[in-house]
Every structure is written in structure tokens, then in C-alpha cells.
Amino acid sequence: MSDAATAVRPSAPSAAPATLAERMAAAIVRQRDVVPAVAAEKLKTCLLDFLACAFEAHTLPWARQAQMIATDGAGPANIVGTPLSVPAPDAVFANSVAGHGLVREDMHTGSVSHLGIVVLPVLLALAEEKKVDGRAFIAAAIAGYEVGGRFGRALITPDFARIFRPTGFCGPMAAAAAASTLLGYDARKTQNALSLSANMVAGQNQWPHTGADEMFFEAGMAARNGLTAARLAGLGAYGSEKALDGEAGLLTAYRPDHKAPDIRLFDGEPEILSVFFKPAPVCNFAQTPSLAALALANAETIDPDQVVSITARVTKAAKAYPGCDYAGPFSRVLQAKMSIHYAVASAILRKKIDEASYRNLDDPALLALAAKVTAEVDDGLTAAFPKKQGAEVSVTLKDGRTLSRRLEDVIPADIPLIRRRFDEAASETIGAARARELAEAVDGLDRSGDVGAIMRLTRTAARA
């Protein structure tokens, strides 16, 4: 055997202060059996929302592509809305892509990341490999959201997000933390998983400019990489203790000050409680502007032909995020779903924002209205971000009037809307009776003795 294979791995002197990865790992292990009731209830809603998105998107091209590279019959894990039984990594990738497929996934504003689509596919796949009870599943999910949220708050800035994909950087660590918790790792294995996942981040934000498909697959890779990191750690793989805060650590390398701040997990309100559910299938930064425009359109009679100009006042982060400050033309659906201009114009023209809003990208009336939208940074809204995500829309008419509506924060989708979207999408795919059974299983997640049953209910008898 080679010297490299037999070498003793280094360990920090006992007197040396713990590294950031070690402190985070210790906190994760300490919290494993703590499941706040309010966080558990939020997680159930996150899971229902994720499944609703995955069901509705599972026939879209990017979801199909992710399914087609999976090896059917080679594993125990299911892909939502299909009859496929595949290895866990394949299921993680495909379900993450489908969960992201509508651009309607859950949103953690502080990290500018979609944590549910990386955490939940990993845990669901693991629950199909080995029986897992609901309480352990919930605790692991809460840990994943916590790590992804706190790490993202330490790393992500508007300038960072202009170039790099936040979910691609926060996702692997969130997924690794969740998997390590569910697998019962001790602090050393958990630290190794976190450190390894820090080397598996990826994703550049060039895709919004043309509406390219990288966005969907970045989430799938982040989720799968997090699972890979956790599994490698479980097999004894060693990750640098200073992978986050060393001289070439992830935070040190990417933060503008090249310093790694302390990250305190489970200190205060759980990060999962900061997650909101999108009311519209559009980019996070287009949510509040479109809602303000929708409220204005419903309150006033606005003739599109009489519109001179539209001003959308938004946060600095919203204007800076690639693809958001774009008036067209639009050649791909994702390109339109990123655009504040398109969402505001659609809200005023159609008085709704839904999937149908993105079926005719060449609508002359919509394009003409979108061209009249200007996005401006509002200092007050920027100061309140990310705790609040506000926007104001003002419409100037030919008669000289200016109509305005300001929202100090996004209005998230409420539970009745989430349930309605789930019922419609799941019933169409697996039938109404099975959809009700699945919803009941999610509602009773904390009492479940076998979470894998949830994914078995998502199967179809034959390819849809």
C-alpha cells in the first residue's frame, strides 16, 4: 500500500481554536434531536410546495432531460410523476430539476437561494434507501435550511449574485448538512461532509441573459454534489478543516473583504422560517413588482394604449440580478420569467401572473408595454432588504395622471393557494384519490414511521 494511503491524517492541536467548519458541524450534531414545532410545520409546507412544483413541471423539457439520463431499474429511488426506479443520485438530480422547473420554488431571501430544491430531494432519496421516521427527516431538513441560509447570508451580496449562482454555492453545503444529519454522522464526519461540499460549488449567472437552461441543472448538481460529499465523508474521506475559513477557503476566496465571518447556527429564529413561497412562477426579484402592478391593475382601470411610461422601483439587488432589468425581446420562457418588465406588463395587461402568461412571448401588446417599463433603485427598499423585499410600481398615463402602488414586502403564497396548486398538479398526474393520500402523508409527516412512502405515492404506473 502506498505511503499516501497509509499516511496519518493531520489533526489540529487540542489547544487550537476550532475552525468554522468544525464549529458548524458541532452545532449540527448538538441540534439533531431538537425539532421546534413551528419549524416542523413550516417544513411540511415546504415539502408540499416542492411536490406541487415537481408534479407540474415533470413533463417540461429540462425535467424530461434530467429523467432521461437516469438509470431506470438500477435503484430504489423514485422520480416524481414517473414510473422510474433509479439510484439515489439520479433521483436527487431529476427531482431537484423538476422542483425548479416552474421557477416557483421556495425562496430564502437572505441567501438569495432556493434551499428546498436542494435539501428535500436528497432527504427523500435517502428515505427510500433506508427506512426513516418523520421526526428524523424533519430535523435533517431544518438543519439543511439552517446551514444554507446562514452560509448564504455570510457569502451572497448583490455583486456576488450578479456573477455567481447563489443556489449553486449555498446548495451543496445545505444538502450535505441535511444528509449528514439524517445519516446520524458524528461531528468529524459532518465536518468532512461540509468541507468536501465547499469544493463542489458551481454556477455562473450568464444564463439569465438568454434564458438558457443552466439554471435548472445548477440546482440538480448542487443537490447531487451535497449528497456525494456526505457519502464520501461517511466512507472516511477527509475534508480540510479550513475549507471555509482558511487562506484559500470558500468564504475567504469569494467574499470581497477576503475574510471569513463567524457563522452561528441555530442562534435565534430558524432559517427555515425566513423562507417564503412564491405566488407567481417568476424570478424572486420580479415577485413584488408584479404583485404591486397586479394590485394597481385590479384597483384602477388602465388602458394599455394610454400608458406613457411605467416605473418599477426596486431594491439594488433586484435591479442588479442578471436578466431582471430587461425589457425584451424574449426568445425563451426563462428569459421572460426573469424579467421585471415582462412580469409588470403582464400583470397590468392580463391582471394575472401564471403559466399562461408565458405562452405567447411575441404578444405585441405585452411587448409594447414591457418596453415602457423602467427599473429604478429605491434607497429605502434597498435598506430594508433582505429582511423585507418591497417594490413600487407607478404608471403615467397620457391624461397626465400617475397611478402608483407600493408594497413594503412580498406577499407570499398562502397555504390554501399552495394546497390548491398541489391538488391540481398531483391529481392530474397520479389521480385525485392518490393525491389526497399523498397530501395526508405530508400533513402527518411528523408521525410517519416511513417517509419513503411519500415518494412511492408519487409514482405513476406508466410513463406519462
Roles of regions detected by a PLM:
Residues 141, 145, 191-194, 438-439:
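Short, well-structured alpha-helical segments that form the helix of a local strand-helix-strand
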Residues 116-124, 171-178, 223-227, 286-288, ...:
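Well-ordered alpha-helical segments within folded domains of soluble proteins
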Residues 130-136, 153-163, 176-193, 206-216, ...:
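Active-site cavity-forming subdomains of large catalytic enzyme subunits
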Residues 196-204:
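Flexible glycine/proline-rich, aromatic-decorated loop/lid segments
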Residues 1-112, 209, 214-224, 231-464:
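Terminal-appendage/accessory-domain detector
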Residues 98-155:
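Hydrophobic alpha-helical hairpins/lids featuring a short glycine-rich hinge
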Residues 111-117, 137-141, 159-172, 215-219, ...:
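Active-site nucleophile and cofactor-binding loops and adjacent substrate-binding regions
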